[in-house]
């Protein structure tokens, strides 16, 4: 159903399996999952248009980027497959947290790793769980491709966001990457 599709887009694989697989088939689903070769799936996954250029713009401006996802053990492999892993640190997935999104634990972990206050960070996400996680952490939320979310900014695509951010001045000499200027 559309509701199940929306649910599995946002939640961890463990939560999704528990919701959509009948209880009497959970062991079978776990066995399939344990034996799945994700490398076979990667050719069917694609990057959003403009993503790499956007990441390069941010990196060139000294703006830090992280991943906060409800994926579990495939995130790093997926980032490496697309050769974009160099842009993100830390990478926080549901398997590394006590409480996945929408709990703010992952956002707090990123802020602590960077040593940054909430007011210097924007969280770009596409789901209600992203919106809730950012809100619970006190971080500005920008909605990607989802105008139904309550966000400080709606981003229809990465090219549009790149154009918006292109006007931000290059890093000021003496300013570190830990002090991005998003104002």
What are these regions (language model features)?
Residues 52, 56-63, 72, 76-183:
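Asp-based, Mg2+/Mn2+-dependent phosphohydrolase catalytic module
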Residues 1-61:
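N-terminal helical cap/lid subdomain that shapes the substrate entry/recognition surface
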Residues 68-69:
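Conserved phosphate-coupling serine/threonine residues in phosphotransfer and NTP-handling enzymes
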